[in-house]
Amino acid sequence: AGPEKGLSLASLAKQPVFYLALLAYAGALAGSYLNMFLTSCGLDAGLPMTAAAMMTTMALLGNMSSKLFLGKASDVFGAVRTFELSILVSEIGHVLLLLGLPASVMAGALLYGITPPLSSVMAPLFCKLFWKGEDYGTAYSYVTMFGTLLVSPFNTWFGKFYDLTGSYDLTIGVSGLLLVITLALVWAGGRSLRAEKKA
C-alpha cells in the first residue's frame, strides 16, 4: 500500500511487481503492433488483395469476441491464468501466420485478434491484483506511460524488418517472442502472488 499522500513513482520503483506489470504491458502492446501488417502478410502468403484485406477484419472479429469473454473468464479462472491462456491463443495465431499458407494466415489472423485485448483488458486486470483503489490508478498510469514509451520504436522496427529480409517472418517472430517474454512475466507475477499469500 502507498503512503497516505498516495503512491509515488519513487515508492513504485522499489516494488519488483511494478517492473513485472510494466514489462508485461509493454510486451502485450508491442505484440498488437503486428495488426497493421496483417494485410501485407496475407499478400505475402499468396492471397489476392481482397482476401488479404479481410485479414484485418478477421483480427477485429477475434478482438471483439475475446473482449466479450476475457472479463468473465478472469472471474472464473483468475486474471493470471486467463492472461496466460490468452497469450497462448495469440501464440498459436502467430504460428499459423508463420506457416504462410492462405488458409493458415486467415485462421492465424482470427486467433491473433486476441492480442490487442492483452494490453487493453488483461493488463489492467493483472495490475489490479497488486494495487487497489487510488494506488491502482496511479500504478497503472505509470505502467501504461512507461510501457508505451518503451515499445514505441517497434512500430517502425516491424516495418524495417521487412525491408531487411523481404519477408514478414522476422516481424511475426519478434512479435511472438515478445509475447513469450510477456507470458513468463505474467507467470512470475502469479508466482509472486502465491508466495505472498503463503507468507
Put a short name on every predicted segment.
Residues 1-18:
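Juxtamembrane intracellular "pre-TM" segments in multi-pass secondary transporters
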Residues 13-70, 154:
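Extracytoplasmic gate region of multi-pass secondary transporters
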Residues 42-43, 73-74, 158-166:
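Interfacial helix-cap and linker-helix signal at transmembrane-aqueous boundaries
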Residues 49-50, 133-143:
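Loop-to-transmembrane helix entry/capping segments in MFS-fold secondary transporters
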Residues 81-96:
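Structural signature of the two symmetry-related core transmembrane helices
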Residues 103-111:
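Paired small-residue
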Residues 118-131:
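Intracellular juxtamembrane helix-capping segments at the cytosolic ends
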Residues 173-199:
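Multi-pass alpha-helical transporter architecture, strongest
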